[in-house]
């Protein structure tokens, strides 16, 4: 399991909204109901290999993209202080082959807030039958 897979697993593993999740690299794909799937992916919005956001795609398995949203980590958990660069928006830095880490200090509660924000958004697409059965 690489760094990104570990972060996705820690943030979204064991939730009650995304069923049968599959994690590969910077991407998680799972089921919301019989027809809808969700794809979560760490993305760079400004600088190559500075993953500062999570992109959420809601997909209908036969008709394609239903919705797509990109949430910046800085919008969710705020700007962070670093010893080197001062105040920066949080991001994961892929420095080389197999070497990635949070460039800014991100706590377990920050990660939980990111996960809760994403899952609140994704949960809006869950069918009422699936939500009621949980």
Regions found by a protein language model. Name each.
Residues 1-7, 23-134:
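Intrinsically disordered, low-complexity regulatory regions enriched in serine/threonine/proline
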Residues 12-21:
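N-terminal segment of the mature soluble domain
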